[in-house]
Regions:
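Histidine-centered copper-binding motifs that mark active-site loops
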Residues: 1-175
């Protein structure tokens, strides 16, 4: 896949898929249908504004901050010393237990081939056909866990390189 390295163009959608066919013209992977599934994260907020907010306050988009109620729940469950030690540990790391990502779904939506979840991108096929799905993570900061409910998937390539086929229920695709 390709993407821009200028300013915040990638975060504004300057990316796309590139599929390079084998030089021999003979693809060792046989499929009745072949789809590129390009996954990405998207915000309507200008990426430079997002970056500015994160530079001023790294947890700006993290609304699930630890509360006094949770602290007292920890005290009753684990004791005062353990509850305070837990808070100190997170403070020393300068993060909190809910800090999974810099930006949350509050600000992001997720796209499949440029379509929002409401658009419901669909790849057509007939029962019994072998369908090749070329998943690409074009997200700026999102890891995607991919599964097709009720179906197994066979991984045959990673980063464009053929691999020993392995059957899985789910794959995780990291940020490039």
């Amino acid at each position: 896949w390709y993407h821009s390295h200028s300013g915040m163009q990638e975060q504004r959608g300057m990316y796309g898929a590139i599929v390079i066919e084998p030089a021999s013209g003979r693809d060792p992977i046989r499929a009745d249908r072949d789809y590129v599934v390009q996954l990405s994260d998207w915000t309507d907020e200008h990426p430079m504004r997002v970056l500015t907010k994160l530079k001023m306050q790294s947890d700006y988009y993290n609304f699930n901050q630890p509360t006094a109620v949770e602290f007292f729940r920890d005290v009753s469950k684990d004791g005062v010393s353990a509850a305070l030690a837990k808070r100190r540990m997170w403070n020393q790391m300068r993060m909190n237990p809910t800090d999974l990502a810099d930006i949350s779904a509050y600000s992001y939506t997720y796209l499949m081939n440029g379509v929002t979840p409401a658009g419901n991108w669909t790849g057509l096929f007939r029962p019994g056909e072998k369908v090749r799905l070329r998943f690409i993570n074009s997200g700026a900061m999102t890891f995607f866990d991919v599964r097709i409910p009720g179906l197994k998937m066979t991984v045959v390539q990673a980063d464009g390189q053929n691999v020993e086929p392995v059957t899985v229920d789910e794959i995780r695709i990291g940020v490039a």
